[in-house]
């Protein structure tokens, strides 16, 4: 059994700056444990889009309520990306648990917390180590904003909210 503090064969431990002899931005998803209760995110399978985020505490999400669940992690995602916290399908389907406010910008270095919403009529118990959400790293485009007098015409025009069918 491997020591908990040792990186797994697939995880690389980087120096403080994440640089290995060059100054190019690191392509790695960097994770810092803020306590011994933090669980390093993992993917459920080689083709999984999301990294599972785990609770660092025992907690409760009240019926029809919400709770902020700490992960005791800080992260750094590659430049040109952001991290999105998304629901886990099993929690959504079986327990009516959803997540909110799930954007983590590439320059944020604070603790990662997960806002859980309970849409059911029963309290939802969260235990230390439970996988509560998934973190998906997505590429982002941030073009300059240009104010214009008119927008280009399209077939759809200003039709919204069901205008293309139900």
Curated annotation (Swiss-Prot):
Residues covered by region (Disordered): 1-24
Domain of life: Eukaryota
Chain residues that bind Mg(2+): 138
Enzyme class per UniProt: hydrolase
Residue ranges the record marks as coiled coil: none
UniProt GO MF annotations: dUTP diphosphatase activity; identical protein binding; magnesium ion binding
Gene Ontology biological process terms in this record: DNA repair; dUMP biosynthetic process; dUTP catabolic process
One Pfam family named in its UniProt record: dUTPase
Cysteine-cysteine disulfides: none
Enzyme Commission number, as recorded: 3.6.1.23
Keyword line: Hydrolase, Magnesium, Metal-binding, Nucleotide metabolism
Cofactor remark from the record: Binds 1 Mg(2+) per trimer.
Tagged with keyword Metal-binding: yes
SUPFAM superfamilies for this protein: dUTPase-like
Cofactor: Mg(2+)
Keyword Metal-binding among record annotations: yes
Note: Silencing of DUT leads to high seedling mortality and affects plant growth and flower organ morphology in surviving plants.
Family from the record: Belongs to the dUTPase family.
Name of the protein described by the UniProt record: Deoxyuridine 5'-triphosphate nucleotidohydrolase
Source species of the chain: Arabidopsis thaliana (Mouse-ear cress)
Gene responsible for this protein: DUT
